[in-house]
């Protein structure tokens, strides 16, 4: 029987099991199965996945993120805010501004601290990737994939594709609560045009500075929030002329609000909370 200490944290209800790999050890070959086991709501702790906080050669810390199906993702906005909170509060970093390595690249985090506790985290998510090759999508073309039609159940849905280090398909609807989240979501997620699968967001524009947001996450299904998805939604809204670049946009997710801005300089900034749920020790056994 093996075990490790964990901290369960969430960003707007998007929860992960966080493991400090400066102190703990999980064999590389076991990571996918452990992520699947620990995320199980019935036989594990229950979460949207597992995130490892690891040493890095190029930043103070490195984030590795696993979905609840065991697949490894390249980035996670809500996860990055929680990693930033954990790293500062556990003295893995000293400054309130620091970098985090991800599989999608290095991002910059800035934490707001009150009485020694991080109350808010802002992440510079870098520039969005907009071409088919960068997203990635099948097909040729170096222009952005904006408002292209997808036929489902005899209804045409127009979506815009954006990568924030992971792929997103953003669909505008009149009412997110009536959107085909659990039906169209998995169909588009696993469509052959996305070789690495895709996260699917449904967006309802409220005004020039606010939107409602629902998400079907690649490898996890319906979640309360998706930070990279919120960033992709704002980028897609600006590309479609629905919002203005440079302004801070309030994204209303099922789990709460994020503040997102696509700056004139090109990077996307995400600001929001990160909270600890519980801490403990998880025991597991890998069958031979």
Curated annotation (Swiss-Prot):
Coiled coil: none annotated. It comes from Bacillus cereus (strain ATCC 10987 / NRS 248). It is found in: Cytoplasm. GO terms for biological process: lysine biosynthetic process via diaminopimelate. This is Diaminopimelate epimerase. It is an enzyme of class 5 (isomerase). SUPFAM superfamilies: Diaminopimelate epimerase-like (SSF54506). The active site is at residues 76, 226. Its EC number is 5.1.1.7. Transmembrane segments: none annotated. InterPro entries: DAP_epimerase_AS, DAP_epimerase_DapF. Belongs to the diaminopimelate epimerase family. Substrate binds at residues 14, 67, 77-78, 166, 199, 217-218, 227-228.
